[in-house]
Amino acid sequence: MADPNEQQKQDLHKEEPFEEEPFQEDLYEEDLYEDDDSEEDLYEEDLYEEDDSEEESIPFEYSATVTPGAAEMTELLSRGSIEILGLMPWSSNGTYLVQVTRGEDYAPAIYKPERGERPLWDFPGALWKREVATYELSRSLGFGSVPTTVARVSAPMGRGSLQAFVPALFSEHYFTLRDRSELAEQLKTLCALDLIANSADRKGGHCLIDEHNQIWAIDNGLSFHEEAKLRTVIWDFAGEPLPNRSAEAMQHLLETGLGAELVELLTPAEQQATLRRTQQVLAEGHFPFDRTGRSYPWPLV
């Protein structure tokens, strides 16, 4: 009889042939970086809408027996039954708010099925696997920057990712958080994660903060491309040294490897590119510059 766990691994990832691509190093060439006023224009308030209303409430009554960062969340999301509550508004892909229940435990979550993804000309499909991979990378590094995210093969609309819903302060985003000194270390950690994951869509609104001042990174599907595609709003730390904790975690990753979970989710080319990025960031020892002024997502929030 076939092993169902082995079959699930095959369903999650099919190995493909690849040609190794060199790692793009120009982000670290400071002499090529033009320090002019054009970059600062991207931060002007008139380029994104600031919500002047009072603190927003969650669009439904949040209730859960398991919190987003709890160890029990992985078991709940991996094995719980899924009930679709509704379609999330303003999402570029099919994204659903769901309720996950297992025994007496329950929590809301975000479900992103593969069948709801819009094809992209410059990015491979199965973005949901990259959502899971970003969580697994954050977990393996000990960063804790991404809400618990699991792969579900059996789900209402087919295979996809399931991520713990964060009851965040939704009026907040990166541009309201970056000047708070007590959050700097968390933001630097997230910046380091995005460098390794090659995040191509780190908008300001993808940085959430909860009532405990924990920063969470969501919408991580555009990541782990084997080509250099870094696009992020987090450039405030350019030239600053990597935090010791982040550097030590990267070194440990290089010594121990990506781990079985990431290997199942990424192609061999993506795995090698991830390790090359880690080596490069660690070797440089500081956060890179955007020498082009174009490595930003749009819209910014």
Where are these regions (language model features)?
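Phosphate/dinucleotide-binding and metal-coordinating scaffold of catalytic cores
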Residues: 1-11, 26, 31, 41-301
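Intrinsically disordered, low-complexity mixed-charge segments
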Residues: 15
